[in-house]
Regions:
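Dynamic helix-loop-helix/coil hinge segments at AAA+ ATPase domain boundaries and subdomain interfaces
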Residues: 31-54, 106
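Conserved Walker
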Residues: 89, 119-131, 144, 148-151, ...
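Alpha-helical transmission elements in cytosolic ATPase-linked domains
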Residues: 52, 83, 111, 154-157, ...
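Non-catalytic interaction surface on structured domains
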Residues: 40, 50-54, 72, 84, ...
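Conserved post-Walker A coupling segment in P-loop NTPases
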Residues: 42, 58-122, 132-148
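Structural signature of beta-strand start/N-cap positions in the alpha/beta core
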Residues: 66, 94, 154, 176-178
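Structural recognition of the conserved hydrophobic beta-strand(s) that form the central parallel beta-sheet
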Residues: 97, 140-141, 157, 177-183
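Interdomain "pre-motor" coupling segment immediately N-terminal to P-loop NTPase/helicase cores
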Residues: 1-34
Length: 186
């Protein structure tokens, strides 16, 4: 069982914030991008560190676990998340990404969970959120560290219960989504 081998239900990647590492990460990003356009079984790495990361990422992709990627801006966190999705059993389902820092706080929950018609002033029709759009696939939450704490709490409930309510809704919506979260914060 790969999940037991990897030690649990959450896997964390960390990219160091050092000039040497950043320089190497440029090469790593290129290798990851190349691997995304190559056949599913191939992996490309130019050095042993990149090869080890790709090898671990491939194992992680086979386990249906939540993934947390931590590292500075520009180190390839989204590219790595796409690599994990592409090599997972969810690869034929949607990969949906959202930058949590770019969404106004008052709109974040409606974008993540959707909303019912009339739940707020401009809600003229029911709308599905990112969780529903990613159902069966992967939801990439970029800059999750910038998400307000109350939204993080609601997100934790979705991870625990595998269901949520749309804003203004009273019926739970079941969801099967793999979360890959990333941040530049420690």
């Amino acid at each position: 069982n790969i999940e037991k081998h990897l030690g649990g239900s959450l896997i964390r990647f960390y990219f160091k914030d050092e000039p040497y590492e950043i320089k190497n990460n440029e090469h790593f990003q290129l290798q990851l991008l190349l691997s995304l356009i190559q056949p599913k079984d191939s992996m490309t790495a130019g050095d042993s560190n990149s090869h080890q990361l790709l090898k671990l990422s491939k194992k992680v992709s086979e386990a249906d676990v939540t993934v947390f990627i931590n590292g500075p801006t520009g180190t390839g966190k989204e590219v790595l998340s796409r690599f994990i999705h592409k090599n997972s059993r969810r690869s034929e389902k949607p990969f949906v990404g959202i930058n949590c820092a770019a969404i106004p706080e008052n709109m974040l929950e409606a974008i993540l969970f959707g909303h019912e018609k009339g739940s707020f002033t401009s809600a003229h029709k029911q709308k599905s959120g990112k969780f529903e759009q990613a159902n069966g696939g992967t939801l990439f939450l970029d800059e999750i560290g910038d998400m307000p704490l109350d939204s993080q709490t609601r997100l934790l409930r979705v991870l625990s219960n595998k269901e949520f309510y749309r804003v203004g809704g009273d019926k739970p919506i079941k969801v099967d989504v793999r979360i890959i979260a990333a941040t530049h914060q420690n």
